[in-house]
Structures are given as C-alpha cells and as structure tokens.
Amino acid sequence: MKSRVYVRFDRGFHVICPYQAKLAGSRKNDGAGYISPLALKSPIGLQHDLEDGCRIRSAFGKCIVNSRFLALIDVRKSGFKERGSKEPHGNSFVYWVTYSFLQFFETTMDELPSGRGMGGRLPFNQSFWEEFLSGREGQLPTLPDISHVSKSVIRILGGNPGSMHLQGTNTYLVGTGRSRILIDTAQGLPVWIDCISSFLHTQKIELSYVLLTHWHGDHTGGVPDLIAQNSSLADKIYKNHPDSGQNPITHGQIFSVDGATVRAIFTPGHSVDHMCFLLEEENALFTGDNVLGHGFSVAQDLGRYMDSLRDMASLGCRIGYPAHGAVIENLPGKLEEYIQHREGRERMMLSALTRQRVRGEGLREEGVKCGLTLNEIVMAIYGKLPPEVIEKALAPSLLQVLWKLTEDRMVGFKPGDPLKRQWFALEQRKRNKARGYPS
C-alpha cells in the first residue's frame, strides 16, 4: 500500500499520520498529512536550535505505541501531556505518529527543504522505505528473547522487531546479585513487560536503577508498564533531560550493584540527550543507538555525533552492547568503521565541490558555475540515479553532511530556493579567515 506524507516548514510543528489527516483537519482530505517543523531561525535550520527542537521532538517519546497505533500529544505547556486520540482544539500542537517511521522523521526533519512561499512539500513514499528496509531486516541473524551475553549482562529483547529496530530493542539486566540495573525499557509492548516481569520473579531479582539511554519511544515506552507492575520503581528511573518524576543522569555518574559498576557517558548526536554506559568490570560499553550491532545508525546533529563517536573510541572499551542488534565483539573496529564511513562521505562531497569550484574559476567566461545543487552533487558522486532514490534515500543524509561542512567552514552556499541552492567549496584562505586563522 502506498501512502504519502508531506513535509512543510512554517511557524508550527506537528506530525499528522496520513491515515488521520481528515480527523486532524488537514487542508486536503486526500490521505495526506503534514510534518511542520519549527520555523527556521538561521541558515542552517534547526541545527542551532537543538535544545528547543529536542523538547518538541520528545513528544514522540510520549506516544504509547503498538505497531501503528496513533497517539495525540498536547504540548502547549512546558510539560507534555498525553490526551489520547481526541480531535485537536484551537492552536494545540498535536502529533499523529506512525511509530514505524519515527526514526526516519527524526533524521530528516532538520534537513528537508522549506520550498516556496510559506513552505514547500516533499513527498515521502512509505512503500519505498518499507521495501528498502525489509531487505536489510531479512538478512539479520536471529537473537533469542532472553540471553546471557556475559557473566553480568542479560539481554531481553523488546518484542518489536522491524525495519527501524532490527531484531527489536535490546534491554539489559546488569549485575550478578539479587539487585540489578536495567538499561532501557523497549517500546512498551505487552510481550516485553510479560517477559521481564516473569524473569525477575522467577530469578528473584530486584531493580535498583532503570537507566534510559535517550528519549526515543522504543527505549522509554516500557517505563509506565514497569511502574504499573512495581510502583516503587517510579523513584528509580534515570534519564538525561528527565521527564517529570524522573531522576537526572550526569556525565560520569556511577551506578553500582553487586558485580557491576556502570558509569554514565554523555554522547549526544543521535539525540540531544543520548547517554552511553560503561561497564567497568568488563571494559564494555552500552552504546545505545549511537552504534548498532548491524549497519549504521542515524544522527540528529552530525557534528556532535562525530565528536561522540571519537569520545567513545577514546574510552578503549573492548565490547559493545548496542540498543539494537547483536553484541559488538570488536567495538574499536566498529567505531573506526563508523567514523571512516562518515568522514569518507564528507571527503567525497568536499572533493566534488572543490573540483567544481576549480573548473568554474577556470571557465568563468564560458558561464560555468562554481557551485553545485544537491542533485548535481549526487550526480558527481554516484552518477545518475532515479529521482525517488535521491529524494527518499540520499537527500536527508547528504544535506546533513553539507550543513556540517558549512559549520566547519569548509563549504558555503548561496541563499535562495533550497531546492535549487548552490553549494560551493570555500578556498583555503577563506576557510582560514572564517576560522580566525592567519591566511
């Protein structure tokens, strides 16, 4: 089944599932909805607005999600309040979401073009992504629902396998005694809470701490179920940028139980609040969504994400326990692969723009331009590709790289229609001047 979601920038921010556009008062009742991110306040959009953007985006994490179940969130006040699936009133900010594509929305909303007038539209073909990601999903190794991955770490799957979650969200019980640490709570599906509750009961295990790597719903969704099972856990939930009633996590904070000393490591980039956790007894790192067991992750802020990957590498941890996928037996190698992958893409794009600048300067009289549009950059690197591949698969990530190169003073752009925007490599002397270095 094909469906469309349209992206639009204006003064508001809401996500409307295409199936619910009519209920939410879409201008056209044609199965289309709108994603309307925060108004652009700088040439590089929301990259400089991460704190506010995180507050708005964190409404996603409040959704009680089962497959394609929809939730409506009212965020008019500083705290987010779940209102159920009622029709919106007045000027409420509302979120209609299909959970299967939360991470896609998360990675693209900063970079998609605003278009003409009050906002342009970029169609999102759901079937394209489902076909692309289902192929990757089919190649994954099978993981058991519960497995002892080390002497002090037990992995319990969240029961939410899918194209965006690989085999499902990994949740971890850490420690060797009766008292344990739980890292992440999965999506909030009944299969997970039933599984972990039964395991805790039969093994006579109690939870001393519940640590959340970040705000995304497939990591925080099980919190209400845990508290419903055991109300005393309400005081034991820890998260960076905590929600009401939760405890904060700070960089370097230590959480200790028998057989496990866990240190919190602030690693923003995938999300603004992302934390990893270092298990000192094993020299192992719970990598959250920054590094996955299979394939590559996505980043909200590419610059901070790259810094976090390097910070993670500097820890020297041997083993990685990712939030999705199998155990990473060679974490240093995986981190190097991630860094080289991202840096390689930066080098390719900068090289393409540099070649065009040199060519344009040499043939200026013949009308050869010095910059390239995004489509022309894709052509220079990958050759001719179908438009839907460029728009749906490449544009979001490549735009993210261009904005990072802009922040690094390596690339500039000419203002104008984002769809036709010219990007160009800065000369070395201009790069030095922009960075405050002597020419």
Curated annotation (Swiss-Prot):
The active site is at 218 (proton donor/acceptor). One of its GO terms (biological process) is secondary metabolite biosynthetic process. Zn(2+) 1 binds at residues 214, 216. Disulfide bonds: none annotated. GO terms for molecular function: hydrolase activity; metal ion binding. Pathway: Secondary metabolite biosynthesis. Binds 2 Zn(2+) ions per subunit. Keywords: Hydrolase, Metal-binding, Zinc. SMART domains: Lactamase_B (SM00849). Pfam families: Lactamase_B (PF00753). Its cofactor is Zn(2+). This is Lactamase-like protein nscB. It comes from Arthroderma benhamiae (strain ATCC MYA-4681 / CBS 112371) (Trichophyton mentagrophytes). The gene is nscB.
